[in-house]
Amino acid sequence: MQKYIVEARSLLALAIPVVIAQLSQTAMGVVDTIMAGSVSATDMAAVAVGTSIWLPAILFGHGLLLALTPTVAQLNGSGRRSQIAHQVRQGFWLALCVSVLIMLVLYNSDHVIKQMDNIDPVLAQKAVGFLHAIMWGVPGYLFFQVLRNQCEGLSKTKPGMVIGFVGLLVNIPINYIFIYGKFGAPALGGVGCGVATASVYWVMFLMMRWYVTRARSQQDIKLEKGFAAPDWQVMKRLSGLGLPVALALFFEVTLFAVVALLVSPLGIVAVAGHQIALNFSSLMFMLPMSLSVAATIRVGFRLGQGAVEQAQVAAYTSMAVGLLLASVTAVFTIVFREHIALLYNKTPEVVTMASHLMLLAALYQLSDAVQVIGSGVLRGYKDTRSIFFITFTAYWLLGLPSGYLLGLTDYILPAMGPAGFWIGFIIGLTAAAILMVLRIRWLQKQPTAFILQRAAH
C-alpha cells in the first residue's frame, strides 16, 4: 500500500502545476471574450467564431508535439540524457513544419466562415481578422510547447505553470492596448484579441527558452550547440507517435462542435443549458487531464529505468486518484448544480435545463477521468495508435450516433433534446474508458522485453 501512496504524492506534485497552467490558458480565453464583449456583441461573437476554428487547428499541433514528453521521460529514466537535446531540436523542426500548415489553414479561413449560414458580413470580417492576427502566434505557441514538453518529460511541471500565469497577466494590458487603441496603437476591437494572444505566445516561448538555458537541472541539455539539420528518421518517429494523439484531440474537439450545431435548432434555452453544462464540465476536466500528463511522465520515466512493475503502479495509481477526484467533483456538481447554473445565467428555464444536464455531467466526469488518464498511461507506454482507434470508435461510432438517436429522433425513446446528446457522451466516454483499461491490461501482460523494446523505440 505504501508504494501506491508514495506514487500518488509524486503524481499530484506533477499534476497540480499542470492544472494551474491550464486554468491560466482558459482564463486567457475568458479575458478575450469579456474585453471584446465590452466593445460590442459583434466583436465578442467574432472572437467566439474565430476561436471555434483556431482551437481544433492549434490542438492538432499541440497533440503532435505531445510525443516529446514520453520520449524525454524515457531517455531521462534510462540515463540517456545526452540524447534529449537532439530529440528536442527535431521537435522544433516538427513544430515549424506543422506551424506552416496551421497558418495556411487559418489564412484561408475566410472560405469556411463565409459558408456559415446567415452569418453577418461584419461579424465574418472581424472573425477572419482575428484569425489572420492570431495565426502569427502559432510558431510561438508550438515552440513554447516543445520546451514545455522537454521540462515535463524531465518531471519539471512548475515552469509551465509560472510562465502560463505570467502569460495571462501580460495578455490583459496587451489586449487593452490593441482592443481599445491605446498608446498610439489602432483600435482593433475583437481583432486586437488575436494580436494580443499571438504576442503573448511569443513572450511565453522566449521566457521558457530563457529558463531552459539557465536552469541548473538542465545544464547538460545543450540545445544551442550549433545548427541541427532536420533528422527525418527522428521526425518521422515523433510524428508517428504524435499523429494519433493529434487526431484523437481533433476528433474530440470537433465532436463537441458538431453536437453544438445539432443542438442549436432546439432553441435558446436548450443551447444555453447545454453550453453551461459543457463549460462547467470542461473546467472539471482539467483535474484528470493534468493527472494524464503526470501519468505519461511517471510511466515513461519508470519504463526508461526498466522498472516495468513500477510503471504498472504509476498507471493504476493515476487512474485510482483520478476516479477519486472525479467522484468528489461529481458529488459537488450534483449538490450545487443549481447554484452553478445561476452563476452563468439567471433565466429560470435555462437554470432548470442546465441543472438537469449537470446530473448527467456528473456521471460523464467519472468515465471522462478514466479515459483521459488511460490515454496518458498509453502515451507513457508509447502506444499511441490505440488511443486514436479507441477515441474514434467511442466518440464517432458510438457516442455521436447514440446521442443523435436519443436527442433528435423517436426511434428508441421520445426525442430527449440536449439530454439525449449527454447520454451519448456518457456512452462514448464509458466505451473509451473500458477500451483504454483493456488495452493497458493487455500491454502489461506482455513479456517485459516486449514492453521495454516498444518503449525504447
Curated annotation (Swiss-Prot):
<feature type="transmembrane region" description="Helical">
    <location>
        <begin position="387"/>
        <end position="407"/>
    </location>
</feature>
<dbReference type="GO" id="GO:0046677">
    <property type="term" value="P:response to antibiotic"/>
</dbReference>
<keyword id="KW-0812">Transmembrane</keyword>
<feature type="transmembrane region" description="Helical">
    <location>
        <begin position="418"/>
        <end position="438"/>
    </location>
</feature>
<dbReference type="InterPro" id="IPR048279">
    <property type="entry name" value="MdtK-like"/>
</dbReference>
<dbReference type="InterPro" id="IPR050222">
    <property type="entry name" value="MATE_MdtK"/>
</dbReference>
<dbReference type="GO" id="GO:0016020">
    <property type="term" value="C:membrane"/>
</dbReference>
<feature type="transmembrane region" description="Helical">
    <location>
        <begin position="243"/>
        <end position="263"/>
    </location>
</feature>
<feature type="transmembrane region" description="Helical">
    <location>
        <begin position="11"/>
        <end position="31"/>
    </location>
</feature>
<feature type="transmembrane region" description="Helical">
    <location>
        <begin position="283"/>
        <end position="301"/>
    </location>
</feature>
<keyword id="KW-0050">Antiport</keyword>
<feature type="transmembrane region" description="Helical">
    <location>
        <begin position="46"/>
        <end position="66"/>
    </location>
</feature>
<dbReference type="InterPro" id="IPR022913">
    <property type="entry name" value="Multidrug-R_MdtK"/>
</dbReference>
<dbReference type="Pfam" id="PF01554">
    <property type="entry name" value="MatE"/>
</dbReference>
<dbReference type="GO" id="GO:0015297">
    <property type="term" value="F:antiporter activity"/>
</dbReference>
<feature type="transmembrane region" description="Helical">
    <location>
        <begin position="160"/>
        <end position="180"/>
    </location>
</feature>
<keyword id="KW-0739">Sodium transport</keyword>
<keyword id="KW-0406">Ion transport</keyword>
<dbReference type="GO" id="GO:0006855">
    <property type="term" value="P:xenobiotic transmembrane transport"/>
</dbReference>
<keyword id="KW-1003">Cell membrane</keyword>
<keyword id="KW-0997">Cell inner membrane</keyword>
<feature type="transmembrane region" description="Helical">
    <location>
        <begin position="93"/>
        <end position="113"/>
    </location>
</feature>
<keyword id="KW-0813">Transport</keyword>
<keyword id="KW-1133">Transmembrane helix</keyword>
<keyword id="KW-0915">Sodium</keyword>
<keyword id="KW-0472">Membrane</keyword>
<dbReference type="GO" id="GO:0042910">
    <property type="term" value="F:xenobiotic transmembrane transporter activity"/>
</dbReference>
<feature type="transmembrane region" description="Helical">
    <location>
        <begin position="316"/>
        <end position="336"/>
    </location>
</feature>
<dbReference type="InterPro" id="IPR002528">
    <property type="entry name" value="MATE_fam"/>
</dbReference>
<feature type="transmembrane region" description="Helical">
    <location>
        <begin position="127"/>
        <end position="147"/>
    </location>
</feature>
<dbReference type="GO" id="GO:0006814">
    <property type="term" value="P:sodium ion transport"/>
</dbReference>
<dbReference type="GO" id="GO:0005886">
    <property type="term" value="C:plasma membrane"/>
</dbReference>
<feature type="transmembrane region" description="Helical">
    <location>
        <begin position="357"/>
        <end position="377"/>
    </location>
</feature>
<feature type="transmembrane region" description="Helical">
    <location>
        <begin position="188"/>
        <end position="208"/>
    </location>
</feature>
<protein>
    <recommendedName>
        <fullName>Multidrug resistance protein MdtK</fullName>
    </recommendedName>
</protein>
<comment type="similarity">
    <text>Belongs to the multi antimicrobial extrusion (MATE) (TC 2.A.66.1) family. MdtK subfamily.</text>
</comment>
<comment type="function">
    <text>Multidrug efflux pump that functions probably as a Na(+)/drug antiporter.</text>
</comment>
